Amino acid sequence: MQNAKAKTITITSVKGGTGKTTTVLNIAGLLSTRKLRTIIVDLDLHSGVIAPSLNVQVENDFYDLTSDIANNRFNQIEDYITKYNDYIDLLAAPKDPRMAYKIDPKYINVVLSRLSFKYDVILIDTNHIIDGVNLITYDN
């Protein structure tokens, strides 16, 4: 675990199809060549495609994490993170897009705070809608 707080980078646009996800993946790849521990947080909660883009199988996702925090079942953040390689990890969007509506935005800061001392960089992929989830990420 690191002592310094991670740099948070949020990629956003108010229009869909502008390359947000591609940009996040390219930045993550670049950061990995610099040996910076990076986590991608897929906050395109209704239609996140980071996991399939990386061709990884996700066991637990963002919904599982926030649900467990809300219901006092949370143990450690690592249980919800999917490893891609030595330098890139993923906190995936919900596998079931219906779960996006069940995520309370107040837990986003809790999650980002827990991640901030574990990684050098937090990359956040968002959707194109300005909502409570995205407004919180803009403040980080």
Locations of regions flagged by a protein language model:
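Walker A/P-loop phosphate-binding motif and the immediately C-terminal alpha-helix
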Residues: 5-46
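Short N-terminal binding/cap micro-motifs at the start of the first secondary-structure element
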Residues: 20, 49, 118-119
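Phosphate-binding loop that captures ATP/GTP phosphates
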Residues: 31-90
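Cytosolic-facing regulatory segments adjacent to core modules
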Residues: 71-135
